[in-house]
Amino acid sequence: MSTSVSIATSSPVLTMNPIITEHDFRFPRRPSAWPGAAIHNAPTQRTXNSNRIPNSRDASASFKEHKTDMATTYSLARQGLGGSALFPFLQNGLADSDRSIDRMQQDDPLATQVWKFFARTKHQLPSQHRMENLTWRMMALNIRRHKEEQQQRQDEADARRKKNMDAGSRAFRLGRPMMQSSPSGIAQLRKSSENNLAQPDAMNLDDFIFSDNSGSPINFASPEGDKMVDDRSGSSMASAIPIKSRKEPSLQNFVPQSVPVQPAHQATQGSEFNYVNRHLRKTSIDDRRTRKRPANFSPQVPAVNSTAAQNDLDLDSELHDYSLDQPNQAGIPQQSNGSNVPFNIDTFMENDSMVNNGNFQQNFSFSPSTSPMIPHGPFSGMYHNSSVPSASMSNNNNNSDFYSPPASAYPSNVSTPHPVPEQEGFYFGSQDARTQRPQGFQQSIGSMLSQQFMYGGSNGNSGSTMFSAPGTASESMSAYSTAPSSFGHIDPSQVFQNEQAVTSPTIQMPQDNMFSFGADSDDEDNNAFADRNVSMQKDMSSSLDESGAMGWDASLPGQFSTQAARFPGGPTRKQVMIGGTTTDFVDNNGDWESNGLERSQSQSFRGGNLRRQHPKLPRNASTPVHFGGQQNGFEQLAQSMQSSPAGDGNGTMSGFSSVAPSRPSSPPMSKQGSTTNLQAAAGNGNDGNAPTTCTNCFTQTTPLWRRNPEGQPLCNACGLFLKLHGVVRPLSLKTDVIKKRNRGSGTNVPVGGSSTRSKKTASTLNSRKNSTLSMSTATANSTKPNSSNPTPRVTTPPATSQPPSSKDVDSPVSGTTSGANTAGSTPNSHFGGPGPSSGAVGGKGVVPIAAAPPKTSPGPGASSMSMQRPATASSKRQRRHSKSIGGDVPVSMDIDSPDSTSSIDGPRPFGSSAGLSSLPGGMSASSFNLNQRPSTLGSATGMISMSGGQTSSLIGSSAGPQEWEWLTMSL
């Protein structure tokens, strides 16, 4: 047994000694393998002894020797294995393990160790030399700063000790008090400032990179405690001014008024500068301290609802400061069960006139002085949107209930607004005043959304009296409650979107606010301070029919909606949609969502800033805008819907009447999608407007009116130049002569007994392409003279006879007309009659717009007027997209689609009436049975200029569906 042990212990040495390279470095080498080992002869001795047979004594000796060898191995492993052989940078790692961290920090700081690490292992790093350089600089700076701080502290301590000793010995010798030799206060102040400058910078790189560095600048930023005591002891007996540290400001200091003022300046109570004699030292202007005492507002608004001291205004000193900026609402407000107003509004006045105006009360917002609980936003959820009787609002029992006069948004300078009450609650989420787009989500009457308080119980009187909701005497309703809710993390503005947006793609009207009833100057206040405007939301849009209250699907036949009737093809495009009365905004910036106080149903089609100059007209919640007195012809949109009340049957067009209908209905449109119904757009004589003028070159003579992107009229030259080149046509290119191309007018076939060749005319009746939305009925081209109403004979080119085709679907046939009364598809052929002849205006002549001596000429190709043939079609040689319209007579705007080349049966409506009261040749519209009412309107009056100078109003009324066709103006 002993032999085996001896062999086992000695055989590894025998196998390892001859060849050193065979050693496995995973295991420690025997001591004899290392050069310079303590025992060199042990292997040879063991080798010689191994030849003889060992006995028990040899076995015990071998165990002893083995124990000695193991001790030597451990000592060598500590020195060699952890040394420079394998890990050179950890050479002193095991040897220094018994040393403390502080000692290691002094001898070998962490920055030095880091530099050593990066310096020795830089061949393994991506940025080798840069890392070594960085760590070297860190180490050098840290060590240098550390040494300088130690030296400075040592020098200061020595100097201080020496100075105290000298001063004490001198005072003892001379018998004088010690304070006489102390430095003055200014000297001490200078010295303290120098000491502060000499202190190290707190920006220690090691702190941010190596957080475990025990030598952080916190240890060196200020002198140590005992040295600070020495400083104080040295200056405690000084006769100088003591420099006291500034006191910590108290946390909350609030003005206990209901006036929203800034918090008062921090009162030092005279303790900071007691060494100064008490006199007024006005060294600076305190902007936070108001000079005047805040006015005693009649309704003192207590920030808290306390029953112990109901009017003690010191209670709201516990509230935090508030901000005028609207805070985000924390979570969804709680839904309460009652339907009463949560606050007794009338608490400080007996007979307040505002109490009975419940509609107005429900829309204002107020902000107490120091209450952060009331957000600076709409109170549509807090004040319930039902018509609250004044009895429930006039309870004077709770003296500390909230009351505030209505906030003032932009007051309407045109008329007193009349907000319309609504029976349903609305919630308008937290909004930025610059983008006022409320989330109009409706809810039932009994469930109003209330705000959340940060304190208080779930009910108004169940929790603490502080911050509980002041309610009515009968029912305490929690407007501010913090009942536990599983939906507290939900933002209602993100969840409850506009509920009509999914089912009904209605036209989103501009944002209506409380005072948004029709002033043209309402938009002037928008751009002043966009983020400071208090635009109060009202719970109901003033556009009753236009706000998309009813969902509709245009594809379903049974869906009733005014929007579906007006726009059968779906929602309109974001451009000037002139159909019915609705002409949405074309603003300069192209943004329809105007954040100011806009109108909803007025919808002025404004271009540029011309609208600023118009006179103000009074409006209320139900009347649409009246366009009287506007200076730009294109801003005269449809004053009323085209299906006006039947009282217009006497011949008075509702567009020219002084009374605009309050709830107009809208006609169905053609499927081509109406662009605009600019009724009387190019100039209304009764309204005192000038003829259509180009906004660029100011001409009134052009073969075709165009529009710029803002919707303002341009002549053909300016509009075409803008379209082709993208820039405004310079005025240097303006010429007074319109060059005409000599184009043939086709075969001349006598129409109505007229066989003479038609010529170009300059009359306002046959003006080609007058796209300023004139009515342009070609009734003046009738070729039958009349004794009572003589007109010159006008011959027209042939109009190819063509039966009504399937293209009649673009404008349905009026039910009151017979098949014999057909007319062309362009405005020059609106009216058909049983007269013996018809003046068909055809050809491709280019004529000026302005009035000129009448000449016989063919009108544009598509304008054929048939009054005696059963099916009269317009000429096929018409020019698409540029249909002629007679004169400066803007009455209705028709869409002439490229497909509508054939005649379309039925009279064309004019204004709100579709009838034809008097035909120019003295012919009465026998099929209409209308009262004839001649008028003497000239060409600039917006009516039809007859060739003989006598005009006749083409106004009437007819039963049955109207036929509508709108003319687009080509750009």
From Swiss-Prot:
Gene Ontology process terms (BP): negative regulation of transcription by RNA polymerase II; nitrate assimilation; positive regulation of transcription by RNA polymerase II
Q: Where is the composition biased (Low complexity)?
A: 390-400, 654-663, 680-691, 796-826, 892-918
Q: Where is this region: Disordered?
A: 39-61, 146-169, 262-307, 390-416, 587-691, 742-918
Q: Where is the composition biased (Basic and acidic residues)?
A: 146-159
GO molecular-function terms, A-Z: DNA-binding transcription factor activity, RNA polymerase II-specific; RNA polymerase II cis-regulatory region sequence-specific DNA binding; zinc ion binding
Q: Which residues form the signal peptide?
A: none
Bias (Polar residues) occurs at: 42-59, 262-274, 297-307, 597-606, 632-645, 744-794, 863-875
List the GATA-type ZnF regions, as residue ranges: 694-718
Q: Cite the record's Gly residues compositional bias ranges.
A: 832-845
What SUPFAM superfamilies does the record tag this protein with? Glucocorticoid receptor-like (DNA-binding domain) (SSF57716)
Keywords, A to Z? Activator, DNA-binding, Metal-binding, Nitrate assimilation, Nucleus, Transcription, Transcription regulation, Zinc, Zinc-finger
Task: Kindly list the places in or outside the cell where this protein is found, as annotated in its UniProt entry.
Answer: Nucleus
Job description of the protein? Major nitrogen regulatory protein. Positively acting regulatory gene of nitrogen metabolite repression.
Mind telling me what this protein is named?
A: Nitrogen regulatory protein areA
